[in-house]
Amino acid sequence: MGNSEIAVVPISAIEHFEYCPRQCALIHVDGIWADNPHTVRGSRAHRRTDDPTKSRKERGKRMLRAVPLWSERYGLSGRADVIEVSEDGTVRPVEHKSGVRHGITADLQVCAQAICLEEMLDTSISEAAIWYGGPRRRFRVDLTPDLRRRTFHAIKEIRQHLVKGVLPHAPNDSRCPQCQLRHHCLPETSANAAEVAVYLQQVLSV
């Protein structure tokens, strides 16, 4: 199935979706974006990996930076921070994050990168990696069947939002205070929209 037949999902949308489907829709359906200290720090952390001219060899491995990725089969497109190529030809994507590890949101993103690389290079990739700037530590990500299944599920859900233009309900939970789109999302108001609608119906029916 080619990209001409399905909506292309940005790889970056996968992490947004896993964090909050409403945040993902605001960014990738409505085109809304705002920075906060977390996103600014992330942008600064990516300055080095965003420059393809910085590709070089480290410890016997080629480090290719800012590599465009795509998958015709799954309708994906994006860019890898770093593609690590070992002397034996082994390839793995390495995602760079400025903060600390929280759950598997970034794991899904780097898994999607590996899926693209497998198609582009006609190869199999068993592991990827994520480098976190907070602890300055690299974590290995095993590309297990379960992780791939969750990644494909996220891709499917995101594509439905893109096609239908659906804006999910706001969760209005512990994620919201840290979200850079809080003032666009209005979680307190959105989460209570159904209650407000019922109240208005009751008032107008009197």
Question: Model regions: which residues?
Answer:
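Juxtamembrane/interface motifs at transmembrane-helix termini
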Residues: 45-48, 114, 147, 190
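Metal-dependent nuclease catalytic cores that hydrolyze phosphodiester bonds in DNA/RNA
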Residues: 1-91, 98-101, 192, 199-206
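Nucleic-acid nuclease catalytic cores
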Residues: 72-78, 84-165, 169-183
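A structural signal for alpha-helix termini and helix-coil/disorder junctions
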Residues: 31-35, 51, 157, 161-164, ...
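Cysteine-cluster motifs in flexible loop/terminal segments that predominantly coordinate metals
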Residues: 20, 166-206
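Short, charged/polar low-complexity linear motifs in solvent-exposed/disordered segments
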Residues: 43-44, 110-112, 157-158, 195, ...
